[in-house]
Amino acid sequence: MFDENSNAAGTTPVASSLAATPNANLVSQVFNVKDSRWLQVEVCREFLRGQCARSDQECKFAHPPPNVDVQQGRVTACYDSIKGRCTRENPKCKYLHPPQHIKDQLLINGRNHLALKNLLSAQLNQTGTPMVNPMMALQQQAAAVNLIPNTPIYPPYYNGMMYPQVLQDPYTAAAVNQVLDSNQEYHSPPTDKKNQQLQTAALLGNVGGLLSAQSAAAFMANSSAAAAAAQQTPSPLLRLQRKRALEEENTNGNDMTSAAAAHTQLLSLAAGAVPMKRPTLDKNGAMLYSPVAQQAQQFNPYLLQTLQGYVPAVSCEYMQPPPF
């Protein structure tokens, strides 16, 4: 049968190890203070009003006699009566002598209370965890961070955008080379063809004896000078394209500069357009907040790229191309 005094045997090893336990004061308070909450029984409300038709042996609530003290609708059962050794007769015992069915329930409550008490003592008697050096913890954290690979981490929805390398079509490559040759021939002056024609005519003339050696040398010098001058002087079409590119670049730069200036001016006007009438003052005369309008800070998600695995917010509303 449950006995509250049996805690004395269980507390001897606990008391011997109090000096080595960091929670010695708490353990001593737990075992030295008696908790009588498990002995409390609720009083029948109908019995208090004089309307309960059941006897004290049938009602599951207590029917205390007049000599028992009732506090907040509850009474405390006599522990000696539960053990069968209460001898208080004059004056009568101020605690409840419960019937058998309430006594059985109180014994169950006592066993549960003792088990909880022993579990709490076991938890408090455990040796404390060793203190962790903060410098060692920081070093371990830095080592764990260095183990993370520096390669970027791509989400799964980026895999469809990375296509494998496709072999080039030989017919397409030949067509591209032909287009490049024709463009080069169009943009550069036709000096090579003229030189080839003149060299052919000179060879034919030398064969027929029409040109002398001096005329041939003069012809070769003139042709080389003409070729050098043609290389230094670009074609009119190429000069026109360069001029257009410079004009477009200057126009775009001026447009962007003017747009940025207008945007900044609008922001400044919007920030100072509605001044406050007067600042709110505290009881001591200090302002609660500044009456000057603060400029809004623009959020830049790319400032967080120093974090490993960070991917800026992107829109995925586009149609993904079909796989090849």
Curated annotation (Swiss-Prot):
<dbReference type="InterPro" id="IPR000571">
    <property type="entry name" value="Znf_CCCH"/>
</dbReference>
<dbReference type="GO" id="GO:0008270">
    <property type="term" value="F:zinc ion binding"/>
</dbReference>
<keyword id="KW-0539">Nucleus</keyword>
<keyword id="KW-0479">Metal-binding</keyword>
<keyword id="KW-0677">Repeat</keyword>
<keyword id="KW-0862">Zinc</keyword>
<feature type="zinc finger region" description="C3H1-type 2">
    <location>
        <begin position="72"/>
        <end position="100"/>
    </location>
</feature>
<dbReference type="GO" id="GO:0005634">
    <property type="term" value="C:nucleus"/>
</dbReference>
<protein>
    <recommendedName>
        <fullName>Muscleblind-like protein</fullName>
    </recommendedName>
</protein>
<dbReference type="InterPro" id="IPR054429">
    <property type="entry name" value="Znf-CCCH_Muscleblind-like"/>
</dbReference>
<dbReference type="GO" id="GO:0043484">
    <property type="term" value="P:regulation of RNA splicing"/>
</dbReference>
<feature type="zinc finger region" description="C3H1-type 1">
    <location>
        <begin position="38"/>
        <end position="66"/>
    </location>
</feature>
<dbReference type="GO" id="GO:0005654">
    <property type="term" value="C:nucleoplasm"/>
</dbReference>
<dbReference type="GO" id="GO:0005737">
    <property type="term" value="C:cytoplasm"/>
</dbReference>
<dbReference type="GO" id="GO:0003723">
    <property type="term" value="F:RNA binding"/>
</dbReference>
<dbReference type="Pfam" id="PF22628">
    <property type="entry name" value="zf-CCCH_10"/>
</dbReference>
<comment type="similarity">
    <text>Belongs to the muscleblind family.</text>
</comment>
<comment type="function">
    <text>Binds to RNA with repeat sequences 5'-CUG-3' and 5'-CCUG-3'.</text>
</comment>
<keyword id="KW-0863">Zinc-finger</keyword>
<keyword id="KW-0694">RNA-binding</keyword>
